[in-house]
Structures are given as C-alpha cells and as structure tokens.
C-alpha cells in the first residue's frame, strides 16, 4: 500500500465520520422539532379546551376551578405515562437480558 492509498483511505474514513455525525445531528434536530411540534399542539388543545369550558357568565373562581381540574387531569396523565414508561423500560431490560443469553448460548 503506498502513501496515496493510505491518504485516500484516511480521508474516506474522515468523510464517513463527518457524514455519520451530521446524520446523527440531523436525527436529533428532527426529534427535537417533533417534540416542539407536539408540545405546541398540546398547548393549542389546552387553549381550545379552556375556550370550550369558560363562558362569559363564569366568575373568576369558576375559571380557577376549571383550570385546577384540567391541571389535575393533565398531572394524572403524566403520572400514567411515567408508570407506563417504567413498565416498558423493565420489559426492555428483560428482553436485553434474554438477547444476551441467546448470544452467549450461540457462542458455546
């Protein structure tokens, strides 16, 4: 192998790494933007829900009760999602252990 082949190989590896990093950065940015879209869609839904519940005849106390109830509902949903994520994480760990055992049994 001569120096020009080594240089080409080296630059090919550098280009591969650059492209790989850029792709990963784009994936992170896309994921971040999707999260922002979801968050803003939720805010729009929340405001629409408020418009549906709040009427001109509501007192300030009535509006506060509506907002408190909606807040409690959303907090309950967050708790449910936290529990579901914990269950999914536990299942993922168990599957990872099983896959590791399969790999070890294949090597033996």
Swiss-Prot record:
The record's subcellular location field reads: Cytoplasm
Is Coiled coil among the key words of this record? yes
Respond yes or no to whether keyword Membrane is given for this record: no
GO CC field: cytosol
- InterPro entries tied to this protein: DUF496
Q: Which Pfam families match?
A: DUF496 (PF04363)
Question: Where are the coiled-coil regions?
Answer: 71-105
Keywords of this entry: Coiled coil, Cytoplasm
The entry's function note states: Pole-localizer protein involved in the regulation of several cellular processes.
Under PANTHER family, the record lists: UPF0265 PROTEIN YEEX
Similarity section: Belongs to the pole-localizer TmaR family.
Q: Please report the name of this protein according to its UniProt entry.
A: Pole-localizer protein TmaR
The species is: Blochmanniella floridana
């Amino acid at each position: 192998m001569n120096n020009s082949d080594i240089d080409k190989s080296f630059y090919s590896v550098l280009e591969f790494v650059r492209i790989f990093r850029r792709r990963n950065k784009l994936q992170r940015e896309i994921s971040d933007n999707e999260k922002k879209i979801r968050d803003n869609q939720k805010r729009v839904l929340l405001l629409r829900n408020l418009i549906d519940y709040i009427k001109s005849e509501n007192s300030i106390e009535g509006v506060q009760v509506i907002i408190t109830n909606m807040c409690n509902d959303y907090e309950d949903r967050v708790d449910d999602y936290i529990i579901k994520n914990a269950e999914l994480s536990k299942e993922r760990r168990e599957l990872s252990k099983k896959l590791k055992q399969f790999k070890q049994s294949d090597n033996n």
